[in-house]
């Protein structure tokens, strides 16, 4: 329930009180009117009983009265006895006045001579008539007092001076004169002779009473009012019942409307207080929500930054790993960071499973380093030029390679029992190539734990793109130039001497054209030379001499040897290599 409903209920109560007051006033008026009507009915009934028979006569005798002015002089003394009939005259007029009004106009002059004769012979009638000529004027105002005849009285009031409407009054006097007993009863009911002022006030009261009676509904307004009052009270009761149901903790014993309204006001005030509290709570929660959203955004931003860092680390690790695991033609970035030794050892440990994929040449070389056993796989690869052979020994464990290579170091070079078909041309290094250009990248191993990475970027035009890694070499270095056909090949051997390397070059497996191989050698006491086939005329040789410098002399090779940890030999046809110490 809202305040508007309570205000409406209060207005309704006020309106109800006003209606009750009006009803009381109206009942008083109706009671007074009923009393007046009863008095008038009594007077009318008495007049009718006394004058039922002579009512017809006045119509014939009414016109002669105005012609009686000559009669007053002979009867001056009897005016004292006549006043009694004067007071009685107006009462019968009230009932008979409507009847004589229409007839008087047609009978003014016709009866003038006739009634005068019979009136004069009357003994008592003549003087009575002469006195009543002036008397009817003051007695006439009493006619308007009765309420039921108000419309007729209005019509008769304006012609107060005319004698025609007043003519019927004297006729009853003649009939009442022989009955003096009735006159005293009627006289006390009549008020004193009215004056002109009372004549003016009486019509106004009659108009009001007539308007009240003429209103639509009349007496039926009371029934309508009662129905409306019942409906109003039923509606009000229903409203209070609804209010009771909506208000909690209402005491059933207190059934008064006032208590219900007070309880409703208190409940409304409590609801308003709760509403304000809830609004404050909503504002606080909104502020907390905004703060939480800001914090969440900050955490998301921080998380995205961490994800970026982790992604960068992952990419760096992937790019930093040697690309021997998967074949690709992509160019490595220059100046790339060195890889930790732990990662290198892990990579070295991955070598044995990969050896299983390359069955015959690699296994033979890992287990049987002497050259006498290696020529076995020659039959499967008889053709020299279409493919270049490469063996990735970097995958082999260091422990296996060390003992195997320490023993063959003093051994003499084995006889070239199985000369490779790729060794035929003389002008080439150790093995001639049919055609095409490439670069030669040499890898040497040493007992040093660290790794020196050399990144060599070569444009794809003359040859393939290769990444070379050079590590410090052992005391007995060896340099190998491996030939290949236009497809880029990678050759890895473990020779004790150059002849041994040349002899093994013909037995190495082949790689397809787009392959670029990079290796990191993890050996402590053996020599490793990795050669990548390239163009016939140009070649790049990288070596690390420890005890004595050794240079491979060839008419097509330009070499530089320096007693430094790293020796870089460049060819004029390729870009300069970049070396980094790990």
UniProtKB/Swiss-Prot annotation:
Residues 220-271 form the bHLH domain. Residues 334-345 have a biased composition (Acidic residues). GO terms for cellular component: chromatin; nucleoplasm. Residues 271-299 are annotated as: Leucine-zipper. It comes from the Eukaryota. Residues 18-224, 319-422 are annotated as: Disordered. InterPro entries: bHLH_dom (IPR011598), HLH_DNA-bd_sf (IPR036638). It is found in: Nucleus. One of its GO terms (molecular function) is chromatin binding. Pfam families: HLH. Residues 61-82, 99-108, 135-149, 160-171, 368-381, 409-418 have a biased composition (Pro residues). Disulfide bonds: none annotated. Keywords: Acetylation, DNA-binding, Nucleus, Repressor, Transcription, Transcription regulation. GO terms for biological process: cellular senescence; negative regulation of apoptotic signaling pathway; negative regulation of transcription by RNA polymerase II; regulation of cell cycle; regulation of transcription by RNA polymerase II; transcription by RNA polymerase II. Residues 109-123, 387-408 have a biased composition (Low complexity). SMART domains: HLH (SM00353). Residues 22-42, 203-214 have a biased composition (Basic and acidic residues). Efficient DNA binding requires dimerization with another bHLH protein. Binds DNA as a homodimer or a heterodimer with MAX. Binds DNA as a heterodimer with MAX and represses transcription. Binds to the canonical E box sequence 5'-CACGTG-3' and, with higher affinity, to 5'-CACGCG-3'. This is Max-binding protein MNT. The gene is MNT.
